[in-house]
């Protein structure tokens, strides 16, 4: 009898392990690039407002620097840039001399730059299915693997926003639906850069993605899947106004023999390996209004920007609304500043069967998103920097 019982248990375990995940709740994580936390206060966003009143809302404090690639990879891994390796949109690899750049397909797709474990790999490692649309880093073979469904951002034309939404609905309707769907949308960042955060074009972009999201959710509900989907909406950073009169030129203050390379203008990583070079730079910039400069060892701890070897020997950080560059500039929107500047903070909304209703979380670190999504998926997170931040919101945000 005991032997028969044990055989039945073994068979049951095998059956459960091979059973498709049809009926399991799916988490859909959507990112709207450059969606400032307070855009819903200025523009007409009825769906995000509905999510706020019937779900969980808050604002995300980005990780430093408040740039697209570093923060999307933070959202995906729960690690700050100093720990996950993507320390800026462009930087130097000290070991090889190679320059990582979003415009360089060779380095952008080099997995050696990407540390930590992104959500799609954490989910796959624990037996879940994943589909990812253009999320930064998802087209890179990190640890030799990519999501089950992925799209190469370098291949043009990209899927339109409507096509991405159509695909999400289609995948949710499959019997073997993905357990995790992640989708990246370039707006309102593109409009914010071109026209500024208060421009009518940016307003239209904000309202358009809200309408897109409303349509997506309506289709999910019409298909009878509303009770099976947890929807989480995030952004990587906010946006503030810049005008060329606020440009600070490095050439006005720095001699070329003081550094090997300047990477970025907001912030600027200065590669100056000799101590005398570093001291010369910091001294020359000490009295310049509207910027701060530190040797790497002196970067303020709250920025969490010291651990990675590829961080510059000197960091130059302009005040909000200023740039440190010699190149051409134009009126428009910018980001990359201290993450505690209000205009840099980003939108957060979440609702679904596993999330509470009518909850305001206030400001929260964006490192909490990774462990939050892992919890919604019922999987164990990899090592990350967001556990403490997640514990602060867990009881408020989650049903269980």
Pin down the residues of each PLM region.
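Bacterial N-terminal signal peptides that target proteins for export
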Residues: 1-9
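Short, structured active-site-proximal loop/turn typified by the sulfatase FGly-forming signature C/S-X-P-X-R
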Residues: 40-84
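His/Asp/Glu-rich, glycine-adjacent segments
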Residues: 79-196, 325
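A long, amphipathic alpha-helix that forms part
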Residues: 158-173, 188-229, 373
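Acidic/histidine-rich catalytic neighborhood
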Residues: 228-229, 235-273
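Active-site neighborhoods of enzymes that stabilize oxyanions during catalysis
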Residues: 262-372
């Amino acid at each position: 009898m005991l032997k028969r019982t044990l055989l039945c248990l073994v068979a049951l375990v095998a059956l459960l392990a091979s059973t498709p995940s049809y009926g399991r709740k799916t988490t859909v994580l959507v990112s709207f690039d450059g969606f400032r936390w307070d855009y819903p206060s200025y523009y007409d966003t009825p769906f995000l407002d509905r999510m706020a009143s019937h779900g969980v809302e808050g604002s995300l404090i980005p990780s430093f620097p408040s740039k697209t690639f570093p923060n999307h990879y933070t959202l995906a891994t729960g690690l700050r840039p100093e720990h996950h390796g993507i320390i800026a949109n462009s930087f130097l690899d000290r070991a090889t001399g190679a320059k990582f750049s979003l415009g360089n397909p060779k380095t952008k797709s080099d997995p050696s730059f990407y540390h930590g474990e992104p959500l799609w790999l954490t989910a796959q490692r624990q037996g879940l299915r994943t589909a990812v649309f253009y999320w930064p880093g998802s087209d890179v073979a990190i640890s030799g693997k990519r999501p089950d469904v992925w799209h190469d951002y370098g291949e043009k034309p990209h899927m339109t926003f409507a096509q991405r939404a159509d695909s999400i609905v289609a995948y949710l309707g499959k019997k073997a639906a993905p357990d995790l769907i992640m989708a990246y949308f370039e707006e309102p960042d593109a409009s914010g850069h071109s026209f500024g955060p208060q421009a009518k074009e940016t307003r239209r972009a904000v309202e358009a993605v809200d309408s897109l999201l409303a349509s997506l959710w309506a289709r999910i509900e019409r298909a009878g899947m509303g009770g099976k989907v947890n929807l989480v909406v995030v952004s990587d950073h906010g946006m503030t106004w810049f005008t060329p009169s606020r440009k600070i030129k490095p050439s006005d203050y720095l001699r070329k023999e003081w550094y090997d390379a300047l990477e970025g203008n907001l912030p600027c990583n200065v590669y100056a390996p000799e101590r005398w070079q570093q001291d010369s730079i910091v001294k020359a910039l000490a009295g310049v209004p509207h910027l701060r400069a530190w040797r790497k060892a002196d970067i303020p701890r709250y920025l969490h920007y010291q651990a990675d070897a590829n961080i510059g020997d000197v960091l130059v950080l302009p005040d909000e609304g200023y740039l440190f560059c010699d190149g051409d500039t134009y009126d428009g929107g910018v980001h990359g500043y201290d993450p505690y500047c209000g205009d840099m903070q980003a939108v957060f909304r979440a609702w679904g069967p596993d999330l509470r209703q009518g909850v305001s979380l206030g400001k929260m670190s964006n490192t909490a998103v990774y462990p939050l999504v892992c919890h919604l998926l019922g999987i164990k997170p990899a090592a990350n920097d967001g556990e403490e931040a997640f514990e602060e919101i867990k009881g408020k945000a989650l049903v269980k």
